A protein has these predicted regions:
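N-terminal mitochondrial targeting presequence
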Residues: 1-4
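Residues embedded in well-ordered beta-strands within globular domains across many folds
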Residues: 12-15, 87
Length: 103
């Protein structure tokens, strides 16, 4: 059986947890001239998000909406923020999941 790498496509986005999404967005916009999406609250995930567009991928900034948010727990361990996850595209999610579970 081939490993999980045979299922992985391109990098879709990198997610960075931040304590203040407005401040972090401003840094990306002013320092890099990045195009920033409008902030969206996703209560079902406990976060507010913005996407920073780049030619080959996206960066997702995540700010917790409340103390119960998993991002809040991440920021308790990493008060200045940091990389939370990377998201890769796969051609077949079911196959990729099975291969990952076998490893």
């Amino acid at each position: 059986m081939k490993g999980i790498l045979s299922e992985i496509g391109r990098l879709n986005h990198i997610a960075i947890a931040v304590p203040n999404i407005q401040k972090a967005s401003s840094i990306w916009e002013n320092a890099l001239g990045a195009k920033i999406s409008l902030a969206q609250s996703l209560p079902e995930h406990g976060v507010k998000v913005v996407f920073i567009e780049s030619p080959n991928t996206k960066v997702e900034l995540l700010e917790p909406l409340n103390k119960q948010s998993p991002i809040n727990k991440f920021l308790e361990r990493n008060p200045n923020g940091g990389m939370h996850h990377m998201c890769y595209e796969v051609s077949n999610l079911e196959n990729a999941t099975k291969k990952q579970q076998c490893q």
